[in-house]
Design a protein with these regions (language model features):
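Active-site beta->alpha loop and helix N-cap motifs at the rims of alpha/beta catalytic domains
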Residues: 30-120
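Conserved active-site and cofactor/substrate-binding residues in soluble primary-metabolism enzymes
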Residues: 17-24, 120-124, 148-151, 175, ...
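Active-site pocket-lining/capping segments in soluble small-molecule metabolic enzymes
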Residues: 3-5, 55, 60-62, 67-68, ...
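Catalytic alpha/beta core domains of metabolic enzymes, predominantly
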Residues: 114-243
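Conserved, mostly hydrophobic/aromatic
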Residues: 12, 29, 160, 180, ...
Length: 326
């Protein structure tokens, strides 16, 4: 059965976030559709009380398991035949797949790495894993050197229903949890009723934990992914959002926004004036507004925020003899 394991907490370093923040982060991961959360021993000792759910403890040696009982699974870097232990095997490239033959007796095996698998007949190789290790539960954790980790993880999940290890925003150089969840949701309706509107809260905690900002164009969680500027796109979304949007912005706690910039056209300017409740004036004045928009945006190399557009439109209409009544 397909399971998504999130190992974001494995990347956290000192100083640790508060217990309450970590607990909230775990709860939100479960909310969006993560099945199991992996964490290191030091994190477990810090957080003390784990929220309800299934957890994997990452240990160096099998002896540490006795000191930390009660977990759903344990990840260990030493080979083990125990049913509750996942052995982790690093394969740096496709040539090392031959090593899998040595793990026929493993109950569960995590295959980590294989960055270059996307450059080869990956479907054939994935099928060979299953045939060579018929009694082993395989957990795939592709790394992201070639920018294709999420695609490989998705393919493994869809074709073989296998377990996948990912991290939020792909922070451990592996598949991005949120991208994987959305892709599976759209392709095979995997957990379609999970609540993804909490993603902005999850993103805010992530940014605080790692003292970094998510790129504005990051798929699923970027702040600007639903900002549309180009005229053709604006027209299409205005008529039928499904033309350009695989899912609604509200599905992930966001909203669509029309941005005025150098790629905008007269229709976009008209719709923006209506949206901001400014008078939609003559075509000539709209052309003048658009001309000024393109000059300013080209010079500043960025689109206009609403406040900047209001000032510009007001000034153009004033110069053309129009008047805005508040």
């Amino acid at each position: 059965m397909l399971q998504i394991i999130d190992n974001t907490l494995m990347a956290l370093k000192e100083p640790m976030p508060s217990k309450e923040e970590l607990q909230s982060f775990c709860e939100l991961l479960f909310t969006i559709g993560v099945d199991v959360i992996e964490l290191p021993t030091i994190m477990y000792r810090h957080i003390e009380q784990l929220p309800q759910g299934r957890y994997i403890l990452n240990v160096e040696y099998e002896e540490e398991i006795n000191a930390n009982p009660g977990f759903y699974r344990y990840v260990c870097h030493q080979p083990s035949c125990a049913k509750n232990i996942i052995h982790e095997l690093q394969l740096n490239d496709i040539r090392e797949i031959i090593k899998l033959r040595s793990f026929e007796n493993c109950t569960e095996l995590r295959i980590k790495g294989l960055d270059d698998l996307i450059c080869h007949p990956y479907e054939r190789y994935m099928g060979e894993w299953q045939s060579h290790l018929p009694d082993t539960t395989i957990n795939f954790c592709p790394e992201n050197t070639f920018g294709c980790a999420t695609a490989l993880a998705f393919q493994w999940g869809v074709d073989y229903g296998g377990n996948i290890t990912a991290s939020f925003a792909g922070c451990i150089n592996n598949a991005a949890t949120e991208e994987l969840i959305m892709a599976l949701r759209l392709a095979i309706r995997h957990k379609p009723n999970r609540d993804l509107t909490v993603l902005p809260r999850l993103t805010a905690l992530y940014e605080k934990f790692f003292s970094m900002s998510i790129p504005n164009r990051k798929p699923i969680i970027g702040k600007n992914i639903f900002k549309v500027e180009a005229g053709v796109h604006v027209d299409g979304i205005h008529k039928n959002p499904a033309t350009y949007e695989a899912y609604t912005p509200t599905c992930v706690g966001a909203k669509a926004e029309l941005v005025i910039g150098k790629h905008s056209g007269t229709r976009a300017v008209k719709w923006k004036l209506e949206e901001l409740k400014l008078p939609v004036t003559t075509d000539y004045v709209i052309d003048q507004i658009l001309h000024q928009v393109r000059l300013i945006c080209t010079k500043n190399r960025k689109s206009l925020c609403d406040e900047e557009f209001i000032l510009l439109a007001t000034e153009v209409m004033r110069c053309e003899g129009s008047q805005i009544y508040c």
